[in-house]
UniProtKB/Swiss-Prot annotation:
Its EC number is 2.5.1.75. The record marks T100 as: Interaction with substrate tRNA. Keywords: ATP-binding, Magnesium, Nucleotide-binding, Transferase, tRNA processing. Catalyzes the transfer of a dimethylallyl group onto the adenine at position 37 in tRNAs that read codons beginning with uridine, leading to the formation of N6-(dimethylallyl)adenosine (i(6)A). This is tRNA dimethylallyltransferase. It comes from the Bacteria. The gene is miaA.
Length: 310
């Protein structure tokens, strides 16, 4: 069974820096587990790792799609599985890093996402029908067929709502039930980063301000001008600008909304990982010494003794 290390947790807790340190110490390559970092030219709002920050560590599933492309959990799972095999064959450690919980669960627990052509044709027909409905109607359908998913889903994420309904209609099984019956396909270790909520929220607010200083408004305007419909336009940090660009919100209201949505997303990320996956949690923000504990945990899992200082 191939080994896979995953670094998970909410936004703004230091996953990127830790993953690069770990990759350097344990001969790893990094696979992005973020649903937005696949998109080219969306660098600021996705907090995409820079070439300098990579420090020569190979990174995968970054800048592989245009903003007009769809990128689903099924696409991620299929591509990441191939990457894991290739990285393992090179004698390196695959390290999946990100906060998109469903993508990671689909990969590590082999969730059935409708991979056959027949399934995909059926999904397309269902999706066409569902796309004609208003959000309130979709939520009502989801509440009827899968209350557990309804209670935890992001009400603003139309794509995820439709996906949850599709799963039920194609498989006859609730998404929430499917996620409760995981099948391990890798020898995986999940390292989770988190910190005290007030500190986390301060870091999120600060990160949004840094994104604004780096040019987030211009990046979002470019995306808005390019197209009004793609999946990429639905991400946090981008979707909030639409009313501002239509002169329906002020700049300060838009910034406040991005910060609010980001905080809510972080809360949902934590809930997901705590409820759906077996994660080993650490707080390296308040307790930097815990990073050494993470290295020890990885060493024990790998069954090797790795020199921490090289």
């Amino acid at each position: 069974m191939e080994k896979v290390l995953a670094i998970v947790g909410p936004t703004a807790v230091g996953k990127t820096n830790l993953s690069i340190d770990i990759a350097k110490k344990f001969n790893g390559e990094i696979i992005s587990g973020d649903s937005m970092q696949v998109y080219q030219k969306l660098d600021i709002g996705t907090a995409k790792v820079t070439i300098e920050e990579m420090q020569g560590i190979p990174h995968h599933l970054i800048d592989t799609k245009t903003i007009h492309d769809r990128f689903s959990a099924a696409d991620f799972k299929e591509t990441a599985q191939k990457l894991i095999s290739e990285i393992s064959q090179r004698g390196k450690l695959p390290i999946v890093v990100g906060g998109t919980g469903f993508y990671l669960q689909a990969l590590l627990r082999d969730l059935e996402l409708g991979g056959s052509n027949e399934d995909r044709n059926q999904i397309e027909a269902i999706r066409t029908e569902l796309n004609q409905k208003e959000n309130d109607e979709l939520l009502s359908i989801l509440k009827t067929i899968d209350l557990a998913t309804y209670e935890n889903i992001d009400r603003k994420n139309r794509r995820r709502i439709i996906r949850a309904i599709e799963v039920f209609k194609v498989s006859g099984q609730k998404m929430s039930e499917q996620q409760m019956q995981p099948t391990a396909v890798y020898d995986d270790l999940l390292i989770g980063l988190n910190t005290e909520r007030s500190i986390l929220y301060q870091r999120i607010n600060h990160r949004v301000n840094m994104m604004l200083d780096a040019g987030l408004e211009n990046e979002a305007r470019w995306l808005f001008d390019e197209t009004k419909v793609p999946q990429a336009n639905k991400g946090i940090g981008y979707r909030e600008w639409q009313d501002y660009f239509k002169n329906e919100k002020t700049l300060s209201e838009t910034i406040e909304l991005i910060q609010k949505d980001s905080r809510h997303y972080a809360k949902r990320q934590l809930t997901w990982f705590r409820n759906k996956m077996d994660v080993n949690w650490y707080d390296i923000i308040q307790n930097p010494q815990e990073q050494a504990k993470i290295y020890q945990k990885i060493e024990n899992w790998l069954g090797v003794k790795n020199e921490l200082e090289r």
